[in-house]
Amino acid sequence: MADSSIYSTLELPEAPQVQDESRWKLKAVLHRPHLSRFAMVALGLLTVILMSLLMYQRILCCGSKDSTCSHCPSCPILWTRNGSHCYYFSMEKKDWNSSLKFCADKGSHLLTFPDNQGVKLFGEYLGQDFYWIGLRNIDGWRWEGGPALSLRILTNSLIQRCGAIHRNGLQASSCEVALQWICKKVLY
């Protein structure tokens, strides 16, 4: 047998341009997750910044004593706002239980100082009048729905089982006596 070799020349069309285009498309597909991740992180940061600014604005606006911001909760008519609380100072007089019911009907409670702080400071703003507060003596002096009283309260008689406040501090009184009262409501 004779040794015969056949040679052929293979001519391929120039395809580097096609390969370059496919490489770019492949790179674009591979880089898309990085871009979407970057976009999500950027949007997340923007959201956090905007929420922080809104909270800061609310604190500045709503935290002021005499806030007039339209989006801040306001006190009902005839109530006085101080910080995040509304206070109602009655003009009429009722016994302690009727005063307690009045406040409850208004979604509030008789004024209390559960941490026993602020009694003296609050009393300085009151005149000569006595006001019922959420304090009574049932097995010891206790704030309504709260802890025991750790302050001194003036009392003259065993029938004085309800607490009142005036400019000189706390005073015990008979619960049937008609006094003005102070309700306290939390705004937010």
Curated annotation (Swiss-Prot):
Lineage of origin: Eukaryota, Metazoa, Chordata, Craniata, Vertebrata
Function, as annotated: Plays an inhibitory role on natural killer (NK) cells and T-cell functions upon binding to their non-MHC ligands. May mediate missing self recognition by binding to a highly conserved site on classical cadherins, enabling it to monitor expression of E-cadherin/CDH1, N-cadherin/CDH2 and R-cadherin/CDH4 on target cells.
Domain C-type lectin, first and last residues per copy: 82-184
Record-given protein name: Killer cell lectin-like receptor subfamily G member 1
Subcellular location: Cell membrane
Tissue: Expressed specifically on natural killer (NK) cells and activated CD8 T-cells. Not detected in spleen, thymus, lymph node, testis, brain or kidney. Not detected on mast cell lines, bone marrow-derived mast cells, or peritoneal mast cells.
InterPro entries in alphabetical order: C-type_lectin-like, C-type_lectin-like/link_sf, CTDL_fold, KLRG1, NKR-like_CTLD
Superkingdom, taxonomy of origin: Eukaryota
Bilayer topology term: Single-pass type II membrane protein
UniProt PTM: Phosphorylated in response to monoclonal antibody G63 binding and antigenic stimulation.
GO biological process: cell surface receptor signaling pathway; innate immune response
Annotated GO MF terms: carbohydrate binding
Induction: By pathogens and viruses infections.
Keywords of the record: Cell membrane, Disulfide bond, Glycoprotein, Immunity, Innate immunity, Lectin, Membrane, Phosphoprotein, Receptor, Signal-anchor, Transmembrane, Transmembrane helix
One GO cellular component term noted in the UniProt record for this chain: intracellular membrane-bounded organelle
Disulfide pairings: C75-C86, C103-C183, C162-C175
